[in-house]
């Protein structure tokens, strides 16, 4: 008698299309599917893969981070490409002239980029301008920037753990005594 093979781990889990039913996103996917197939550029394949991603994997990119990344040597006069949202940052006073391509740009960020003499493209315009992704810099927001990541990692209360505990409130009586001070049991 043969042994049955476990087939539960056979399937490769990855997105082949976006979960969203947004017709405009679907049109972009159609366009970049074509470009990824017909051009030999990795840029189009990466953009296509990112168009499929969930919102948590397409975190917003702040204007300040984009400016910092575009100031690096060799990135002058290049287009910043973000498969996601570009948001404003009030801490930045001077916005340089930028050429940006993004899925969405918040209204304040949009007005500030345009006021500085910059240009904002959509992905279909980018496909016409540089179908192979030449002269572009692909950027993305901080994926681990969400508050929820502070709760992940070594269990809170164990030595050298900086993990944030899920606490009802931040009062004197909550997770402040035992394990936190030597006079109350022990200190981690």
From Swiss-Prot:
Keywords assigned: Cytoplasm, Endoplasmic reticulum, Isopeptide bond, Phosphoprotein, Ribonucleoprotein, Ribosomal protein, Ubl conjugation
One term under GO cellular component: rough endoplasmic reticulum
Region (Disordered), start-end ranges: 150-188
Subcellular location: Cytoplasm, Cytosol; Cytoplasm; Rough endoplasmic reticulum
GO BP annotation list: cytoplasmic translation
Signal peptide: none
Record keyword Ribonucleoprotein present: yes
Keyword Zinc: no
InterPro entries given in the database record: Ribosomal_eL18, Ribosomal_eL18/eL18-A/B/_CS, Ribosomal_uL15/eL18, Ribosomal_uL15/eL18_sf
Gene3D superfamilies per record: 3.100.10.10
Biased composition, class Basic residues, residue ranges: 161-171, 178-188
Residue numbers bearing the Phosphothreonine modification: 158
Chief location of this protein within or outside the cell: cytoplasm
Post-translational modification Phosphoserine, affected residues: 130
GO molecular function: structural constituent of ribosome
Pfam families reported in the protein's UniProt record: Ribosomal_L18
Covalent cross-link site, Glycyl lysine isopeptide (Lys-Gly) (interchain with G-Cter in SUMO2): 119, 164
Subunit comment: Component of the large ribosomal subunit.
Family the entry assigns: Belongs to the eukaryotic ribosomal protein eL18 family.
Function as written in the Swiss-Prot or TrEMBL entry: Component of the large ribosomal subunit. The ribosome is a large ribonucleoprotein complex responsible for the synthesis of proteins in the cell.
UniProt-recorded name of the protein: Large ribosomal subunit protein eL18
UniProt source species: Mus musculus (Mouse)
Organism ancestry: Eukaryota, Metazoa, Chordata, Craniata, Vertebrata
Gene name of the record: Rpl18
């Amino acid at each position: 008698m043969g042994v049955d093979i476990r087939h539960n781990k056979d399937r490769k889990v990855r997105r082949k299309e976006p979960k969203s039913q947004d017709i405009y996103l679907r049109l972009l996917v159609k366009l970049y599917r074509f470009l990824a197939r017909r051009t030999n550029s990795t840029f189009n394949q990466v953009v296509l893969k990112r168009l499929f991603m969930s919102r948590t994997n397409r975190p917003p990119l702040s204007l300040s981070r984009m400016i910092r990344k575009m100031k690096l040597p060799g990135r002058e006069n290049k287009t910043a490409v973000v498969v996601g949202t570009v948001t404003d940052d009030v801490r930045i006073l001077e916005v340089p002239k930028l050429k940006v391509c993004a899925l969405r740009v918040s209204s304040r960020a949009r007005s500030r980029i345009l006021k500085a003499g910059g240009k904002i493209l959509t992905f279909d315009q980018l496909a016409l301008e540089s179908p192979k992704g030449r002269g572009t810099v692909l950027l993305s927001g901080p994926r681990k920037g969400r508050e929820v990541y502070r709760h992940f990692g070594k269990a809170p209360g164990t030595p050298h753990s900086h993990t944030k505990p899920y606490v009802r409130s931040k009062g004197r009586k909550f997770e402040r005594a035992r394990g936190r001070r030597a006079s109350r049991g022990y200190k981690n």
